[in-house]
């Protein structure tokens, strides 16, 4: 599902379980790879949310996105922080599970 500055907060606050928020842009080769790899991977999340960084400058600023793709974990409306891993399923699973153990915070 695609989110933007106007829809992200409501969607993330209402979504039960784990959500992976993924910032990408059309001109980013690694982002195109992420759009292929992530939906096909078996990840410990209930859903993937995509944000076009070029169209959602407010979210980019609030989440402190500097490099794309940028991945963040949200659980039951709480922010668990960035997920930093290569775009390979085992590494992503491990990074998501590590992020899931963090102390939850309010969404940025």
Predicted region positions:
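Thiol-based oxidoreductase modules, predominantly thioredoxin-like and allied folds used
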Residues: 2-3, 23, 44-58
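Short acidic active-site motifs
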Residues: 7-11, 55-59, 91
